[in-house]
Amino acid sequence: MQPTDPTKFTEQAWDAIVKSQEVARRYKNTNLEVEHILLALLEQDMGLAARIFQRAAVDGEGLRQQLEIFTNRQPKQAYVEQLYLGRSLDVMLDRADAARSSWEDKFISVEHLLVGFAEDDRVGRKTLRAFNLDPQDLELAIKAIRGSQKVTEPNQEEKYEALDKYGRDLTEQARQGKLDPVIGRDEEIRRVIQVLSRRSKNNPVLIGEPGVGKTAIAEGLAQRIINGDVPESLKNRQLISLDMGSLIAGAKYRGEFEERLRSVMKEVTNSDGQIILFIDEVHTVVGAGGREGSGSMDAGNLLKPMLARGELRCIGATTLDEYRKNIEKDPALERRFQQVYVKQPSVDDTISILRGLKEKYEVHHGVKITDSALVAAATLSHRYIQDRFLPDKAIDLVDEAAARLKMEITSKPVELEDIDRRLMQLQMEKLSLEGEEKRPGLGADKSSKERLEKIQQEITELEGQQQELSGQWLSEKQMLEEINTLKEKEQELRLQVEKAERATDWEKAAKIKYGELEVLQHDIEEKESKLLEIQGSGNTLLREQVTESDIAEIVAGWTGIPMNRLMETERQKLLQLEGHLHQRVIGQKEAVAAVSAAIRRARAGMKDPSRPIGSFLFMGPTGVGKTELARALAGFLFDSEEAMVRIDMSEYMEKHAVSRLIGAPPGYVGYEEGGQLSEAVRRRPYSVVLLDEVEKAHLDVFNILLQVLDDGRITDSQGRVVDFRNTIIVMTSNIGSDHILSLSADDADYDKMQKQVLQSLRKHFRPEFLNRIDDLIIFHTLKRDELRRIVVLQIKRIEKLLDEQKITLSLSDAALDHIVSAGYDPTYGARPLKRAIQRQLENPIATKILENTFVAGDKILIDCVDGQLIFDKEIEPTTLPEEPEENITAVEVEVLSS
């Protein structure tokens, strides 16, 4: 039979015939033979031939080598211009056509070519014999894959074992112990089983936020099926996860995707309920394959009839948003699915889940995970990582902390790396000194020789330490690896016990459980006790335990919250609060005390946990420390002044500007950018939010602030909920400043002044807004002695700047008093002080530095004489070096005497 008509062959079979010519030219053969066709078939991506040989237990690489023996026997030519059809290939094609006819197929397909190959005397039989096979064995493998299907279409091969190609058998993975244990979720799994047991519309869809464990529920069902912990209607069923990506990938022509999906569905329906399909991200089914105006049908429409009739049992999983966007808009598809809502587990449930997963992660990473680390992962992730969901974020913390520790174990310890670096430096210095010694005409001086001896001595000592530490590190590392290998074997034996128990082979299960497993556990205990002895001596180089601090470090890396703040107890942090704030905010004892008390109340659990840490309205004249107190709060509570989100409320005077806080509505310019307040807090949820000059904002702004102050949350223009529970909200206002300036000097009138200020507030702000603020704090005008302390703080700032230029600064009390007098103005607070310091200190010092009057190493002395600041520098007395008189030359004596 001449292979000239492609219409007689399937696509894969014809592709192999065409590519066999390239194979023949590659081996420089002039005749096109059976072996070239087989090599071309084996080179096809996801080809049927490779799957058939795999089913017949034939090694693909071994088969390729066997076929190459025949190609090497053929006559070769340096340049193959024309190929000739070999006699054995002609016979093979005739046999393939005969097989097609006897099997009542329309096209010659890959399996027909393989039947012809198996009956070939020159190559086929000899090749199969090398693998202890005969033509009947190959035919059985073909029929096992092909089943009862007929070759009626050119792409028929793609429809064989469609579920194997486009799916993943979860029950088989559960049988092999490849799935993680599923802890809890009993209620959801029972609901899924209940829906699957229905006569029609038996298709549950798992709906929940990303990371709450929807896929885990399907895996839990697979494990229950394997263990027989399901009703009769689900016993011995296969749960197969459909991979929509591989189903769509490579579908180039119209209708190709639909054909693949139909072949999958046909396999499922032909199984008579033995196969349950699991489609993760089921929303991708809706619209998949459909093209506007192309006439092709999307996957959702293909599924509807089978879902409704109960021919197909399918479990879907998708997020709430995707379900709303894609499935709810198609009511015909939605009614065929029964919703099973999967909620986020609590912190306690998450800890239980982590305890169940602990062993898997320990064996994978080769480390130990402490229980306190698991508790920390659940609690810290719940508290500090707000944009993700439990248990996924807690599992990720444990996984990353274990991976980090594993990396430390496999890398050199810090102590050894330090020694290596020091040795490298010394070796370079030694080479330099030795080169100087060998240079002609230049001998090394006495100091160089002494230095060389010291270097050599240090190198010898360090090499000894390096050898000792390196040996210790390698032995500890080896011991940890041995323990991990034993634990892997232990896990394999446990899996064998489970398999034996499922197969009711109690003898085998007992033999492993009370024989091999006990011996292995004893070996592990011995190795671990040896490791504990080394660690107990305090000389260990490697850590093998993931602790609470490791988890905290990972959280710090994710969220930007410094590590020491996470581990510091609330009691220590809050007891230091007032003292720390007073270092930055001079005076204002009442304000600092009120802020500290409110934060202590919130952190001690005496306030609704759904509200922000604290919300304050700071009132007072300009320059008295309102903004500085907000900065100090951010610096202390969050270790960074950058954790303060400052919004100037004078920018929100118009009604339409309010939308800038939470983002423009859909359809308006700037919708994608988000709001200034919502985006800032969403990106940095642990911050001090400063709303400056709040009385200047439009009244509608306060409507938005009401839900922030009361519920600790806000919904931006894109529907995202922004969490304000870990923020401190500080609002500043100048309302009532005239009352504070006129009355605050007299303590007796304080109550009267306070009433007048509050009365002014009530005139401007609505009662529902004022009622939601934790504390209204009045800032007093600054007194002269407080201004003096502020000057001292500012001088320290200048000293830091000068320190970079190696210049020191010293002020007399008179100079300090002069600066205070120059900048004292009760109406404007501390701000005139800053201008006075700039004018009277910074400007003259800057000029003298540029004139080289003050240079590195100088100490600037500043005093006040007759109302003017005098700048001078301290002159250090210079002393000549003492030398013996007999060594002084005549010239030097003359200079000294003069």
Curated annotation (Swiss-Prot):
Residues 161-344 are annotated as: NBD1. InterPro entries: AAA+_ATPase, ATPase_AAA_core, Chaperonin_ClpB, Clp_ATPase_C, Clp_N_dom_sf, Clp_R_dom, ClpA/B, ClpA/B_CS1. It is found in: Cytoplasm. Residues 85-148 are annotated as: Repeat 2. GO terms for cellular component: cytoplasm. Residues 9-74 are annotated as: Repeat 1. Residues 6-148 form the Clp R domain. One of its GO terms (biological process) is cellular response to heat. Residues 345-560 are annotated as: Linker. ATP 1 binds at G208, E209, P210, G211, V212, G213, K214, T215. Gene3D superfamilies: 1.10.8.60, Clp, N-terminal domain, P-loop containing nucleotide triphosphate hydrolases. Residues 782-898 are annotated as: C-terminal. Keywords: ATP-binding, Chaperone, Coiled coil, Cytoplasm, Nucleotide-binding, Repeat, Stress response. ATP 2 binds at G620, P621, T622, G623, V624, G625, K626, T627. Residues 395-536 form a coiled coil. Residues 570-781 are annotated as: NBD2. GO terms for molecular function: ATP binding; ATP hydrolysis activity. Belongs to the ClpA/ClpB family. Homohexamer. The oligomerization is ATP-dependent. Part of a stress-induced multi-chaperone system, it is involved in the recovery of the cell from heat-induced damage, in cooperation with DnaK, DnaJ and GrpE. Acts before DnaK, in the processing of protein aggregates. Protein binding stimulates the ATPase activity; ATP hydrolysis unfolds the denatured protein aggregates, which probably helps expose new hydrophobic binding sites on the surface of ClpB-bound aggregates, contributing to the solubilization and refolding of denatured protein aggregates by DnaK. The Clp repeat (R) domain probably functions as a substrate-discriminating domain, recruiting aggregated proteins to the ClpB hexamer and/or stabilizing bound proteins. The NBD2 domain is responsible for oligomerization, whereas the NBD1 domain stabilizes the hexamer probably in an ATP-dependent manner. The movement of the coiled-coil domain is essential for ClpB ability to rescue proteins from an aggregated state, probably by pulling apart large aggregated proteins, which are bound between the coiled-coils motifs of adjacent ClpB subunits in the functional hexamer. This is Chaperone protein ClpB 1. It comes from Synechocystis sp. (strain ATCC 27184 / PCC 6803 / Kazusa). The gene is clpB1.
